[in-house]
């Protein structure tokens, strides 16, 4: 999204470039504990446990590996990008520069003006045609030539959801990016947008029948599209809710429940760690700065639905819903023409760390559904091992663990941070400041799982989870460096009611003025200034001074002894 040089607004945050550069270096190591993480030598590993008897072999390790990727990436074929964002350049940033393993391209499902190389088309075309004629052939040609042959790339699209905001839709079919898959995207665009039927082949229009909507401005029309995906591609499609709170009043929790109830294998992810972080209003959340719009702010760069402890995401998890949080770049461009700023390149700032046996788009979708994922900004951490153990086994992110009432649950957290992140000074110089991200604390968050709310009852509108709380705050006093280079900590809790556990970590202390209060993130302020270059550097420093990660939950189902 293009951002013009901003005018002054309520609640501003003015920065000088040099001051923020210094502040960044302070904030990365500052906070409730101060200093760097435990820097002792690696401790000796514990003595190995006796080998299990042949009658009780250890459980097999989960198949797969950790991968890193982005589900929300635009190119020049979107109507609000810039000439610098050709397909080849975007893929080069994602894979060659920032080392991602997988990318879902997600250009707007609107009229498209350009081909994949940025050449202006003689006439506007539906993006589904641009995908079929330009984007997919180029992806296939690159991979056939050996370029990115070991990467997973596929074409999805960002849909303007009727009466809501944006959703990423992937229609993979049994053969992603095949002629059948591309035809399905074209049919979706015909049925569920206001595109003129004359823009589509007459034979297809005759076969598809009348368009699904009229004004494309009701929630019911969005539900029609979800139902269509479920009917036709129940196992090979998804709809991700993008930047859900960017504009006030776009979703109620009842509507989110309704979509997930209808198609739980399709509507299962929220883009809580939003892209467009280079905008003056972080994430492009630029509604009026008034108290009524506090739910439409970001909090440490995270959407209110996810950032609010005991809020919407926790309310959904408290029902046992498998709805996951993700982090995406929403890349259009970083800066353009020295005037505008938008977001970071794929893999530069926002990352999804996803575990799975990922070889292609279908296995990627399966891994996303499984939910063994943590999302992070600014490479605060680059590895996380989060387990809850009972007498029945071990639960990991996205799974459910059985436990007996009253038994001790052993919760372990192991994490690692890289030697540096991608903070540049000056922005765009290619000169990295060699700032090592430092975790100040990690919150272990727990909430009770009380069962599904039913349509037509007051509970279906419940957008809070009163039982959700921080049960343990880990600091450098709690963790130790282990033999594998991870900082490790543990905590024991008694199994009571059905519960879930999740993690949230930051480089900030618990009470940093303007940033956190009692460990909770505060709403992000607008960053502005009349000098464009200084403003770009201030925005960049703001983002790298305020880093968070969020894990997906581990569910625990408790049975009576």
Feature map (PLM): residue ranges:
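Short secondary-structure boundary/capping segments
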Residues: 117-126, 169-171, 254-257, 284-289, ...
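A metal-dependent hydrolase metal-coordination microenvironment
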Residues: 54-251, 307-308, 328, 513, ...
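Short, solvent-exposed beta-strand-terminating loops
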Residues: 35-36, 109, 174-182, 272-283, ...
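Acidic, His- and aromatic-enriched active-site or binding-groove loops in soluble protein domains
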Residues: 129-131, 173-192, 256-277, 345-362
């Amino acid at each position: 999204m293009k951002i013009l040089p901003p005018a002054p607004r309520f609640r501003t945050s003015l920065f000088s470039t040099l001051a923020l550069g210094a502040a960044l270096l302070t904030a990365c190591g500052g906070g409730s504990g101060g200093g760097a993480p435990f820097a002792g030598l690696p401790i000796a590993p514990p003595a190995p446990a006796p080998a299990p008897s042949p009658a009780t072999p250890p459980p097999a390790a989960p198949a797969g590996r950790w991968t890193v990727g982005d589900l929300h990436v635009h190119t020049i074929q979107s109507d609000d990008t810039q000439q610098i964002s050709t397909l080849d350049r975007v893929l080069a940033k994602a894979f060659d520069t920032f080392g991602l393993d997988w990318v879902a391209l997600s250009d707007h499902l609107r009229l498209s003006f350009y081909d994949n190389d940025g050449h202006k088309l003689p006439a506007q075309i539906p993006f589904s045609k641009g995908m079929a004629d330009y984007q997919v052939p180029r992806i296939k040609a690159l991979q056939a030539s050996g370029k990115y042959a070991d990467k997973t790339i596929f074409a999805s699209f960002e849909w303007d959801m009727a009466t809501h905001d944006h959703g990423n839709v992937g229609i993979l079919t049994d053969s992603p990016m095949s002629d059948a898959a591309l035809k399905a995207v074209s049919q979706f665009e015909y049925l569920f947008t206001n595109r003129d039927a004359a823009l589509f082949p007459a034979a297809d229009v005759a076969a598809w029948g009348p368009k699904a909507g009229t004004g494309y401005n009701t929630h019911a029309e969005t539900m029609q599209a979800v139902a269509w995906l479920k009917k036709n591609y129940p196992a090979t499609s998804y709809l991700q809710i993008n930047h859900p709170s960017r504009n006030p009043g776009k979703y109620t929790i009842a509507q989110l429940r309704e979509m997930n109830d209808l198609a739980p294998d399709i509507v299962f992810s929220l883009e809580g760690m939003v892209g467009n972080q280079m905008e003056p209003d972080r994430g492009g959340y630029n509604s009026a700065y008034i108290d009524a719009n506090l739910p439409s702010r970001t909090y440490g760069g995270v959407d209110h639905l996810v950032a609010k402890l005991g809020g919407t995401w926790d309310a959904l998890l408290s029902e046992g819903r498998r709805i996951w949080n993700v982090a995406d770049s929403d890349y259009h461009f970083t800066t353009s023409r020295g005037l505008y700023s938008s977001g970071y390149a794929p893999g530069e700032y926002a990352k999804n760390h996803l575990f799975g046996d990922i070889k292609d788009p279908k296995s990627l979708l399966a891994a996303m559904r499984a939910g063994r994922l943590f999302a992070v900004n600014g490479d605060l951490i680059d590895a996380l091992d989060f387990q809850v153990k009972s007498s029945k086994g071990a639960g990991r992110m996205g799974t459910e663990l059985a436990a007996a009432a009253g038994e001790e649950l052993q919760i372990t957290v192991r994490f690692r941070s890289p030697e540096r992140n991608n903070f540049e000074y000056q922005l765009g110089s290619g000169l990295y400041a060699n700032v090592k991200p430092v975790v100040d604390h990690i919150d272990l968050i727990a909430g009770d799982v009380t069962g599904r709310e039913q349509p037509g009852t007051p509970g279906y509108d419940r957008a809070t989870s009163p039982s959700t709380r921080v049960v343990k705050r880990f600091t450098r006093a709690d963790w130790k460096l282990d033999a594998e280079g991870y900082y490790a900590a543990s905590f024991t809790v008694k199994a009571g009611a059905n519960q879930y556990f999740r993690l949230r970590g930051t480089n900030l202390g618990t009470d940093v003025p303007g940033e956190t209060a009692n460990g909770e993130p505060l709403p992000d302020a607008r960053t502005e200034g009349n000098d464009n270059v200084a403003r770009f550097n201030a925005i960049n420093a703001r983002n790298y001074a305020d880093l968070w990660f969020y894990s997906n939950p581990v569910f625990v189902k408790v049975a009576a002894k």
